[in-house]
Amino acid sequence: VKILPPALPALFLAAALPSLGLAAERPEGIAAAEAIAKAALGADCDMNGMEEVPMVGPEAEGFGHALYRFTYKPDYDPNGPGVEATLYQLFCGSGAYNIRNAFVLQTSDADTPKLIAFATPDLAYAYANEENSRLTAEPKINGFRATTLLVNASFNEKTRTITSHAAWRGIGDAWDSGDWVFRNGNFMLTRFEFDPTYGDPDPAVPESYVVYEAGK
């Protein structure tokens, strides 16, 4: 079986940024979060060379940092006071159609913020033709690896879920998507789905493969 990790061909292509419009003031702690991400990721988190990345909202399509605050009860002290958490979603850079994001978490029970590492399946699959439009068999999971960069990520404050959706090329026919839910101070992988096939939809080929779903 040929092992082909999901490729993100446009992640490192230079791209012009859209107009950011009015940006929020940079909050306390954002500079420290940036420093952690840059130190760990180097050129993969060059933030498109911007000296100061603005704080932006959904209207800016992710070309900036975002901040979320919430409180949770840790397992080690469920009856005690809640732990305050600040989640920094950092714009690390962009390509032609993908945005790279890193996430840094600061909690009131920890002295320093931490760069979040996300569990991701290591996939094994093989194409059945030169067009890469179908597989020889259903994909398998070799195991799991950790990544500190997600693509086109978003955070759902209600469910406390980070979701990523990476397009493997511009038209988006091949892609991968993951969900990570916040539980007891960490983000846990709960679902991973991908479509490694290219070209027009084929009724004989599955639309996508859910290769991991927690509890199943």
Per-segment meaning from a language model:
Residues 21-83:
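Terminal domain-start segments
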Residues 90-97, 108-109, 165-172:
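Short, flexible beta-strand-to-coil junctions
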Residues 7-18:
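Bacterial N-terminal signal peptides
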Residues 116-184, 188-216:
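Short aromatic loop motif centered on NTY/YTY
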Residues 96-104, 172-179:
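Structural motif
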Residues 80-91, 100-103, 157-165:
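Acidic/hydrophobic-patterned starts of short beta strands in beta-sheet-rich repeat architectures
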Residues 109-116:
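Surface-exposed loop/turn elements that mediate protein-protein interactions on large endomembrane-trafficking
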Residues 1-6:
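Positively charged n-region of N-terminal signal peptides that target proteins for export
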